[in-house]
Regions:
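Heptad-repeat coiled-coil signal-transmission/dimerization helices
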Residues: 43, 47, 82-83, 87-90, ...
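GGDEF/GGEEF active-site signature
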Residues: 87-150
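Conserved nucleotide-binding and Mg2+-coordinating catalytic segments in signaling enzymes
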Residues: 27-45, 62-75, 84
Length: 187
């Protein structure tokens, strides 16, 4: 290859490498490295599209109960393992009709198309998420408070309103003596 051809090819090779690197970084930024779920940014774009397409969407906000205690008692590796298992259980529940994400820390989010028996589905989610986690020969207690919002019941279908309503429902669930129960609130 002569020097003139090399001089022409080098910038193209540089741009191709740079584009590949940016594509990889963008994909990585949209996936949580610990759980593999979508990050807030990756989840939000898909959730907004889902709300526009599916009037029957349900937004869920989930928070692990007493997660700090689990971390302090059993160690951060055990806490990370509990987060990964929770993410797997949530993703399995969402299946093909929903999208799960991790907002950060011990908070998760999901959007799903409403099934005719959604209350039963929320109960099955609660049961699945509140199962102990087997870690290093121990059974770690895991419980999750779940808040939900039926988008069709909002005056204006928006993701921000649905998340705010699901957040209120989640804290109402945390405030109950039993916790661990799904709550649905709508304005």
């Amino acid at each position: 290859m002569d020097t003139q051809a090399l001089a022409l090819a080098l910038p193209l090779i540089g741009w191709a490498s740079h584009t590949a690197l940016l594509t990889h970084r963008l994909a990585t930024a949209r996936r949580d490295p610990l759980t593999g779920l979508r990050t807030r940014a990756g989840w939000t774009a898909l959730a907004e599209r889902s709300i526009r397409r599916h009037r029957d969407a349900v937004v869920l906000l989930l928070d692990l109960d007493d997660f700090k205690n689990l971390n302090d008692t059993h160690g951060h590796a055990a806490g990370d393992f509990a987060l990964v298992v929770t993410a797997e259980r949530l993703a399995a529940w969402c299946g093909r009709n929903g999208i799960a994400g991790r907002l950060g820390g011990d908070e998760f989010v999901a959007i799903a198309r409403q099934a005719p028996d959604l209350d039963l589905d929320l109960e099955s989610l609660r049961r699945a998420l509140n199962q102990p986690v087997a870690y290093a020969g121990r059974r770690l207690p895991v419980s999750v408070s779940v808040g939900s919002c039926h988008v069709k019941d909002l005056p204006v279908r928006s993701l921000s309103d649905a998340l705010a309503t699901a957040d209120s429902a989640m804290y109402a669930a945390k405030g109950t003596s039993g916790r661990r129960g799904p709550r649905t609130l709508n304005r």
